[in-house]
């Protein structure tokens, strides 16, 4: 009996939330008109691509026992900065480089504040969230910045093998960061840092440097997501991605990544992202009013945290 119980726990840990997604997807396919259409499937994948891209590195932040609230602001600001630089220089490469550079810089600042200065991740990233959002408004004068380089739009509006390019970018991120978290020393050290910071330090893991690298990566990937979003919208918009950070964290935790650190797999992230995307897509097709969708988003976040607490109790953490 005990072996059966252990076997179920192992199965649930590895694929439980993916099974939940499969059931949810099947139910929606039979009960929601137009859900399983090709156009809607493409729209569903496109709608979760930004969350999926950023969640890949949020996984590392959470696994290390921290989180980053500035990612939504970085997405907006990176798109604006890319648009401004592109328009002034006439170079798509310079624009993309500027957006990525901004994301990496914000991530580095977050990492230094948290790892070196010892400031709590909540306070540090909440501060940079406000600063970066404000900077985006200043650079854009509070308005959308139209992009004049048509070649830039290929990044967000083209397709390959039947899938939109942003979805391919998301899939590549899933593969690369999934390999990093599960197959490399960097990933193992990240999980060790989140599981027991003091033990990780005593084991010789350079914890401060590791945290700095993790947050720098998070900033860079958020910058990439902002550039892709600007390409999709054909403009840099300082108002986009408000609340995106909570969606990303909720997706990770709903999939099984622990808020307290030390636990995380890419399969968890994929499951959480797909579940959130499916629920929202179904609500849109059912014409659920936006006000009620806000309530549903809050309930999803609360459910995610509840799952995390139950897992902690079950594991004795």
Name each region found by the language model.
Residues 1-26, 30, 202-209, 281-317:
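Cytosolic-side transmembrane-helix boundaries in multi-pass membrane proteins
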Residues 2-8, 67, 104-145, 183-185, ...:
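Short loop segments and helix-boundary regions at transmembrane helix junctions
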Residues 33-43, 136-142, 180-187, 214-251, ...:
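Inter-helical junctions in multi-pass inner-membrane proteins, predominant
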Residues 48-57, 73-77, 104-108, 171, ...:
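Hydrophobic alpha-helical segments embedded in the membrane of multi-pass proteins
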Residues 91-99, 105-110, 114, 161-236:
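Helix-loop-helix "hairpin" substructures at the membrane interface of multi-pass membrane proteins
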Residues 117, 121-184, 210-213, 232-241, ...:
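Transmembrane helix-bundle core of multi-pass membrane transporters
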Residues 216, 222, 232-297:
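Transmembrane alpha-helical segments in multi-pass inner-membrane proteins
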């Amino acid at each position: 009996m005990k072996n059966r119980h252990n076997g179920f726990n192992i199965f649930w840990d590895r694929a439980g939330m993916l099974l939940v997604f499969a059931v949810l997807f099947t139910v929606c396919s039979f009960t929601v008109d137009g859900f399983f259409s090709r156009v809607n499937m493409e729209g569903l994948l496109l709608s979760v691509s930004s969350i999926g891209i950023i969640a890949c590195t949020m996984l590392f932040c959470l696994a290390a026992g921290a989180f980053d609230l500035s990612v939504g602001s970085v997405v907006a600001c990176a798109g604006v900065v890319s648009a401004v630089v592109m328009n002034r220089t006439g170079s798509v490469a310079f624009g993309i480089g500027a957006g990525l550079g901004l994301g990496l810089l914000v991530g580095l600042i977050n990492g230094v504040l948290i790892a070196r200065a010892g400031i709590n991740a909540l306070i540090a990233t909440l501060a940079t969230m406000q600063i970066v959002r404000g900077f985006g408004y200043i650079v854009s004068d509070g308005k959308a910045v139209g992009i004049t380089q048509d070649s830039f739009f290929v990044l967000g509006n083209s397709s390959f093998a039947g899938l939109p390019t942003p979805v391919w970018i998301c899939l590549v991120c899933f593969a690369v960061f999934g390999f990093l978290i599960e197959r490399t020393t960097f990933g193992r050290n990240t999980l060790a840092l989140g599981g027991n910071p003091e033990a990780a330090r005593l084991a010789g893991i350079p914890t401060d440097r590791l945290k700095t690298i993790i947050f720098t990566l998070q900033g860079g990937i958020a910058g990439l997501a902002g550039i892709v979003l600007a390409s999709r919208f054909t403009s840099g918009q300082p108002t986009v991605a408000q609340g995106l950070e909570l969606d990303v964290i909720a997706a990770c935790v709903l999939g099984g990544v622990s808020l307290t650190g030390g636990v995380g797999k890419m399969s968890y992230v994929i499951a959480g992202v797909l579940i959130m995307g499916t629920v929202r897509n179904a609500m849109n097709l059912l014409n659920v009013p936006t006000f009620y969708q806000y309530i549903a988003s809050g309930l999803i976040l609360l459910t995610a945290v509840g799952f995390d607490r139950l897992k902690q109790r079950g594991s004795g953490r």
